[in-house]
């Protein structure tokens, strides 16, 4: 595949349906490095059956919200990749917030755990936005999301992940590089 230019992406978005993952397929293989939303869309669709009614509505509405938001703003932002990438993340965050991703995660811990898998390719800014949206929830929801993610990392990755997550310095300790 040859990378798609921003104008190719814009043309594709203009013709994409607002249901399904077609809009997000347009973002793949772009010269602006906007890959990742298609994988998230596919994960949501593949796990949709495991969500409760509120979760199923969230899946449908959040994907539609992001697709419509990106499509409606693409022509204002397509000229500069950084602005385009930021716009996609902002639309994603707005949609998750407006549609209460925290409530959905709280009432669908298993299903959200299936969605929050470690992506095959790092870095993935849109996966990070999804995780940040979930980690901004209440402590109980964050604990469920973290536990699900750590469980899916497997034993080889669990220890380094926990080490990076924990702070081992005592509060009174001033043994940093500047002391």
Swiss-Prot record:
Localization per Swiss-Prot or TrEMBL: Secreted
Family: Belongs to the stanniocalcin family.
One GO term of the biological process aspect: calcium ion transport
Function according to Swiss-Prot or TrEMBL: Its primary function is the prevention of hypercalcemia. Upon release into the circulation, it lowers calcium transport by the gills, thereby reducing its rate of influx from the environment into the extracellular compartment. STC also stimulates phosphate reabsorption by renal proximal tubules. The consequence of this action is increased levels of plasma phosphate, which combines with excess calcium and promotes its disposal into bone and scales.
Disulfide bond entries: 12-26, 21-41, 32-81, 65-95, 102-137
Residues carrying a glycan: 29
GO cellular component: extracellular space
Tissue and organ expression note: Produced and secreted by the corpuscles of Stannius.
Protein name: Stanniocalcin
Quaternary context: Homodimer; disulfide-linked.
InterPro entries named among the record's database cross-references: Stanniocalcin
Annotated Pfam families: Stanniocalcin
Transport is among the record's keywords: yes
Species this protein is from: Oncorhynchus keta
Keywords for this protein: Calcium, Calcium transport, Disulfide bond, Glycoprotein, Hormone, Ion transport, Secreted, Transport
Major localisation: secreted
Gene Ontology MF terms: hormone activity
